[in-house]
Amino acid sequence: PHNIHFITSPSERVQLAVIGNRPSYIGFIPNPTEKVQLKAVEKRPECIFLLQKPAEKVQLTAVLKDPRYLSAIREPTEKVQLAAVQKNPECIRHIAEPTEKVQHMAVQRSPDIFRQIRQPEESVRLAAVQAKGEKSGTCPPRPKLYNWRLSETIR
């Protein structure tokens, strides 16, 4: 398996045999097929870091195992972004340009997360404010103050 980098164009069968023994060797395979990428990431999700352009299915597999693997993906598709943010809203900080839909998903799951969005859409800011208001219910009652001069409680 360790000689894979000496083969110019290994067949998919050879690639799969190598990955079956050592998933991390995917880094030595030039342009691995989607099937090979998937096998490596299914065995060891951290192999996503070794892939230049992982296929969407491979991205999803890694992110569903652990949303933090999103940080290894240069250009995650919206579907992958949504899957990661649905599992862990804080993953939005690893997305350079989250779509409005992804931003809304993150804010629905955790309203305070909008602070971690680089350029939140106006509708997302509004949704965050509304969500925070709904979670806290109505405004809390004003505290009673005691006026020492008048010796009475003021509302």
Residues covered by each model-derived region:
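Alpha-helical scaffold segments
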Residues: P1-R155
